Swiss-Prot record:
This is Elongation factor Tu 1. InterPro entries: EF-Tu_GTP-bd, EF-Tu_GTPase, EFTu-like_2, EFTU_2, G_TR_CS, P-loop_NTPase, Small_GTP-bd, T_Tr_GTP-bd_dom. Residues 137-140 are annotated as: G4. Residues 82-85 are annotated as: G3. Residues 18-25 are annotated as: G1. The lineage of its organism: Bacteria, Pseudomonadati, Pseudomonadota, Alphaproteobacteria, Rickettsiales. Its EC number is 3.6.5.3. CDD domains: EF_Tu (cd01884), EFTU_II (cd03697), EFTU_III (cd03707). One of its GO terms (molecular function) is guanosine tetraphosphate binding. Mg(2+) binds at T25. Residues 174-176 are annotated as: G5. NCBIfam families: EF-Tu, PRK00049.1, PRK12735.1, PRK12736.1, small_GTP. Keywords: Cytoplasm, Elongation factor, GTP-binding, Hydrolase, Magnesium, Metal-binding, Nucleotide-binding, Protein biosynthesis.
Amino acid sequence: MAVAFNRDKPHCNIGTIGHVDHGKTSLATAITIVSSELSDGAVKVKNYDEIDSAPEERARGITIQTAHVEFISKKRHYALVDCPGHVDYIKNMITGASQTDGLILVVSGVDGVMPQTREHVLLAKQVGVPSIIVCINKIDQADPELLELIEMEVRELLTKYDFPGDTVPIIRCSALKAINGDSDAKKGILELMDAIDDYIPQPTRVLDQPFLMPIEDVFSILGRGTVVTGRIERGVIKVGDEVEIVGLRSTQKTICTGVEMFKKELDQGQAGDNVGILLRGIKREDVERGQVLAKPGTITPHCSFEAEVYVLTKEEGGRHTPFFQNYRPQFYCRTTDVTGEIALLSGKEMVMPGDHATLSVNLVAPIAMDQGLSFAIREGGKTIGAGKVSKIIK
């Protein structure tokens, strides 16, 4: 039986990004250790292997599926998303990072800024992450003079991608020493937690709109049924509420029979919470990532829409050349990515990098859509544009 969740502090979602092996997962472990001490054991210590849990990750020592870890600071309750750090898994990072209220950029004090560090900061800008804080990790192995240079380099990088590089807090840590019980290293982790509290603003949660949660993952729990997980985008859900599963296939109705966050039972889930929702009478194969769970009748699936789109320049990491009629990239909306064919409107022959354009899009599968839905456009492993649905056609 799960214990009840204590909602006495505001909830906030943050993520870790940064180059592979710079210590993102170790940092997550160190934070749970310090938080567990701070909260008298209310937070469970998560060791490295528990966070790095997919079998292929452990074989390669890298984090693939975005892992959620809980911690409590002096001011807030957090879900920490350990964003994947391997180049093949940028797709996961897009959905992981776009669900966060802020990010910790982890940079090794030994290696400094690496190609993935740049790529992740660019992606954070592209998916609209509101704020970034920096942790220079592995300082026990680093040359102190080099640390100054690394800090300057990180500030320049953040400024380049329109984050406030001059004022971003940069905290020096040694996650591994903190894990091994070093008291000075633990102080560094605590300093990082305080900086997150103070620097990352508490987001406004949309509680008064109809419930909607993009589905990130689906599990089958023996004897209890099917659980879908995700971050609630808007509204509130209570046990006994009727919900619809919308997008990618025929809409289904079901009833919420349980809401949990970090294995603790909630009387209700609300916007901003990372939850598991137990669904009555739904089989594991009836539901998939990329669908949404919503209050009945509040959102419908569509394939065809018009959108206002900005196409990234080469300098922003986008295409080097224009695209034409019938271009078929992937559209990333919430937790799904679907191929769509683009029709250029008003007699346009092509769209150049750097252009703002109105396009008509026809997706190969219907997704839950409302006017104003944001999406990223990707092709061949890179983001080439971003847009919003301006009109639903069918």
